[in-house]
Swiss-Prot record:
It comes from Hyacinthus orientalis. GO terms for molecular function: serine-type endopeptidase inhibitor activity. Belongs to the Bowman-Birk serine protease inhibitor family. This is Bowman-Birk type proteinase inhibitor A6. It comes from the Eukaryota. The keyword Disulfide bond applies. The record marks 18-19 as: Reactive bond for trypsin. Keywords: Disulfide bond, Protease inhibitor, Serine protease inhibitor. Disulfide bonds join 9-66, 10-29, 13-62, 16-27, 36-43, 40-54.
Length: 67
């Protein structure tokens, strides 16, 4: 799995796999963003001003707000 510092940030992970160690987990991010992060395999438009949500399980830094 990718090193933590190379992962996209996600303030609110809504679903995660249950693996050990924690770094091995992939999650679905509940954040609504202006543009999906690079590597998101399922990016969907949502009906809000800022626009998109990555709906696929990806490696994230959960609980971190993007700068």
């Amino acid at each position: 799995w990718p090193p933590v510092e190379d992962r996209p940030c996600c303030e609110r992970c809504t679903a995660c796999t249950l693996m050990l160690p924690d770094e091995a987990n992939t999650c679905v991010c509940g954040d609504i963003v202006p543009k999906c992060h690079q590597g998101c395999s399922l990016c969907e438009r949502v009906d809000t001003p800022s626009g998109y949500q990555c709906k696929s399980f990806e490696y994230y830094n959960c609980g971190t707000k993007c700068p």
